Amino acid sequence: MATTERKPLLLDFEKPLAELANRIDQIRQLAEENGVDVSGEIRKLETRAMQLREEIFSTLSPSQRLQVARHPRRPSTLDYIQAISDEWMELHGDRCGGDDPALIGGVARLGGKPVVMLGHQKGRDTKDNIARNFGMATPGGYRKAMRLMEHANKFSMPILTFIDTPGALPTVVAERQGAGEAIAYNLREMFSLDVPIICTVIGEGGSGGALGIGVGDRLLMFEHSVYTVATPEACAAILWKDASKSPQAAVALKIVSHDLKNLGIIDQILPEPTGGAHSDPLTAATTLKQALLDNLDELDRLTSQERRQLRYDKFRKIGVFTEVAH
C-alpha cells in the first residue's frame, strides 16, 4: 500500500482543518525567517488541530460519511489485499469470454492460511475509473466472482469479499447480458457454500451490486463506509424528484455503520483512523487483518452445516414483515 506523501484532498467539512494547517505553516515560516522561537505556540495549534479533527469526524452526518466513503484516496480492494496478504495471485476471466476489471479476485495467504479474496475495484484517476467502470461490475464480473468462490469451495479455502461499489453497471448491455440473473445466482449459491465467508464493506455498499458478493457468515463494515439499497441521490430523485434532498435521504435510508449494527444487518464495525481510512491506510489495513483473522478463527470452530444454517438464519432475520388486517 503506497504511503508516499501527497497533498491532501479535502472534503468540504474539512475546510476548518485546512485553515488551521495553513496558519501553522505561516507561523512556522515567519519564525524561520525571523529567527524567533514559536514552538510553544505551534504545539498549541497542532493540539487544537488534532482536537478539531476528532470533533469533526466523531459527529459526521450520514451524507458526510458518504463523502468519506467515496474519497478518491480511500484504500481499495487491491490496496487492502496487498497490505494484509502474505501471498497474492490474481485470477482472471469468467470462462465466458470476459474479464471484468471492476471485480477482481484471486488466491492468497492470510496469516499463513490459503484463502480466496475478491472485491470491487475502483480506479485512482479518471482514466483508471473509466477502465474499471467506477467499480460497477458487469454480469461477467459476478460470474467471475462465482467461479472463484466455487474454486474456494472445492479446495476448502475461506472466502473474503470486499464491497466497494455504487451498484452494478446500469447499462442496456449489462441488462441484455443478464445482470439480474448473475446477481441472483450468486445470492442463491453463496448460501450453499461449505466454506467460511466473510464480507467487508470497505467503501460504498450499493444496492444489488453489493449484494452480489455480500452473502456471508459475517458482514463487517468500516466505520465511515455506507451500505444501502440505493444511493441517497437516487432515493431523493425517486421520492422527491429532487436530488438536492439527498442529505435527508441519507438519514432516512440508515446507511451508516452504527445504524446498520443496531438494525442487526452488519455484525461488526471496524474503527477507522481519525480522518478516515485514507488518512492512515496501513492502520486501517492492520485493523481489517486482525478482524478477519479473529472471525475466521471463530468460524473454523463450526461445521459446514452449522455455518450454512447460521448464514441462512442471519439473512432471514433482516427486515420486518407486517400483515395488515382487512
Curated annotation (Swiss-Prot):
Please name the Pfam families in this protein's record. Answer: ACCA (PF03255)
The chemistry this enzyme catalyses reads:
N(6)-carboxybiotinyl-L-lysyl-[protein] + acetyl-CoA = N(6)-biotinyl-L-lysyl-[protein] + malonyl-CoA
Q: Which GO terms describe its biological process?
A: fatty acid biosynthetic process; malonyl-CoA biosynthetic process
> Which intervals hold domain CoA carboxyltransferase C-terminal?
44-298
Q: What does this protein do?
A: Component of the acetyl coenzyme A carboxylase (ACC) complex. First, biotin carboxylase catalyzes the carboxylation of biotin on its carrier protein (BCCP) and then the CO(2) group is transferred by the carboxyltransferase to acetyl-CoA to form malonyl-CoA.
- Self-association state and partner proteins as the record states: Acetyl-CoA carboxylase is a heterohexamer composed of biotin carboxyl carrier protein (AccB), biotin carboxylase (AccC) and two subunits each of ACCase subunit alpha (AccA) and ACCase subunit beta (AccD).
Its GO CC terms are: acetyl-CoA carboxylase complex
Pathway named in the protein's UniProt entry:
Lipid metabolism; malonyl-CoA biosynthesis; malonyl-CoA from acetyl-CoA: step 1/1
Q: Does the keyword Lipid metabolism apply?
A: yes
Q: Which domain of life is it from?
A: Bacteria
Q: Which family does it belong to?
A: Belongs to the AccA family.
What subcellular compartments does it reside in?
Cytoplasm
Can you say what this protein is called?
A: Acetyl-coenzyme A carboxylase carboxyl transferase subunit alpha
* EC number(s) reported in the record: 2.1.3.15
Please give the InterPro entries that the UniProt record associates with this protein: Acetyl_CoA_COase_a_su, ClpP/crotonase-like_dom_sf, COA_CT_C
Q: Which PANTHER family match?
A: ACETYL-COENZYME A CARBOXYLASE CARBOXYL TRANSFERASE SUBUNIT ALPHA (PTHR42853), ACETYL-COENZYME A CARBOXYLASE CARBOXYL TRANSFERASE SUBUNIT ALPHA, CHLOROPLASTIC (PTHR42853:SF3)
